[in-house]
Design a protein with these regions (language model features):
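DEDD superfamily 3′-5′ metal-dependent exonuclease/proofreading module
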Residues: 1-154
């Protein structure tokens, strides 16, 4: 049709090689590889999201997705906030989900299942929901960043 959708994973598998992915086609490996390899992407995402024309319903306007530690670019999935950053220590001790972070697909599936089927406080359920939204938003942004990078290569 006129608006066919393209699976970026297929594009990556067929046409993209980056040694920083260590042979993986996973978005969790491709995103950090792109951040390490592209000066265009580095320059753009080293700024707060509000200054590069991005809005967010789940992150503050001053969120920066490109951070370095000891000269190395950090994986943005490791920048996702702790699941219970808005809870007190006492509230954390009474949580039932036994999750720390939602920063990969397995944790996201587990978290979603737990909020569906576990009896937990509304506050814990809300925190897990927020963590899922943040994770999904970063996944979406990762696809945008990868697409932007691919556009610079053609």
């Amino acid at each position: 049709g006129t608006r066919d959708m393209v699976d970026l994973c297929e594009v990556i598998k067929r046409y993209y090689y980056n040694p920083h992915t260590q042979g993986s086609n996973s978005i969790k490996k491709v995103l950090p590889a792109v951040l390490k390899s592209s000066t265009f992407i580095q320059a753009k995402y080293a700024k707060p999201i509000e200054s590069i024309g991005l809005g967010s319903k789940n992150f503050p306007p001053e969120q920066i997705w490109l951070e370095k530690e000891n000269g190395e670019i950090r994986n943005p999935y490791n920048l996702l906030p702790s699941l219970y950053e808005n809870l007190t220590q006492e509230e954390i001790e009474t949580t039932l989900s036994e999750l720390d972070n939602v920063n990969d697909g397995g944790a996201a599936l587990t978290a979603y299942g737990k909020i569906q089927y576990m009896d937990m406080s509304a506050k814990e359920r809300n925190e897990i929901g927020l963590a899922l939204k943040r994770y999904c938003e970063l996944d979406t942004l990762a696809m945008v960043i990868i697409y932007e990078h691919l556009k610079t290569l053609v």
